[in-house]
A protein has these predicted regions:
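Anion-binding and metal-coordination hotspots
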Residues: 1-226
Length: 226
């Protein structure tokens, strides 16, 4: 259980989570399943750089319904440019501080384009498509998640992590912060996890004792006994 402040994005906590896993277990996992909230290029790059295969939930990206989405444009890795549905090139112009490359079309070409109204907003003069510098890592993670092995690994996430987290929130009060400070919240989270583990231990003991009880009374009596 990794506790952070409410003003810290979950994606920013990935390096600390990996360090904590490695310090506790002595090694890092080969695969890591994450929900759609972690579906971005920096997270995929961080995991792959540590030899961890990301298994990410799909995020349906939003865009204006009256304009063409980014996925309608074809990327050419050799020329480092995009091609629009009409065949025009969008060349790389700049890279912002967040690591996104901006590919822009020629305003003079877009002015007379027949698909201009469906391509971008009326107030704009050209189409701009962004691509992260680590987009290749995200595309590799998406491709693996769609494979049978990736689907199988991701299905285990909802049976284990999501189920445990839902029980902690619904049944054990982890939905609300009952203490102040990160140290106190870690204490609440660890106590909640301890309670869940004790419930699992009690359930397993009851199942094993029930099996022994049934097998004992279902065994036929020895005929040599009086």
């Amino acid at each position: 259980t990794h506790i952070t402040g409410a003003n810290v994005n979950d994606c920013d906590a990935i390096p600390d989570v990996l360090k904590e896993i490695e310090s506790r277990l002595g090694s890092l996992p080969l695969f890591m399943g994450l929900d759609a909230g972690y579906h971005n290029a920096p997270v995929a790059h961080q995991l792959r750089s540590r030899n961890i295969q990301p298994v990410l939930g799909h995020r349906r990206h939003t865009h204006a319904h009256d304009t063409l989405s980014k996925h309608r444009f074809r990327y050419n890795p050799e020329l480092n440019c995009y091609t629009c549905p009409e065949g025009c090139l969008l060349e790389h112009k700049t890279t912002d501080r967040d690591g996104y490359r901006h590919y822009c079309s020629d305003a003079r070409t877009c002015k007379d384009c027949p698909g201009r109204e469906k391509c971008f907003a009326e107030k704009s003069v050209r189409k701009v498509v962004t691509r992260h510098v680590w987009q290749d890592d995200l595309e590799q993670a998406d491709a693996f998640t769609k494979t049978p092995a990736g689907k199988n690994l991701y299905s285990w996430r909802k049976q284990t992590i999501e189920r445990s987290f839902a029980d902690a929130k619904q049944l054990h009060g982890l939905r609300y912060a009952r203490m102040l400070g990160l140290a106190n919240m870690r204490e609440q989270a660890f106590l909640t996890a301890a309670v869940q583990n004790m419930k699992k231990i009690a359930s397993l003991l009851w199942q094993s004792l029930s099996c022994l009880w049934i097998s004992f009374f279902s065994t036929p009596a020895c005929p040599c006994l009086p």
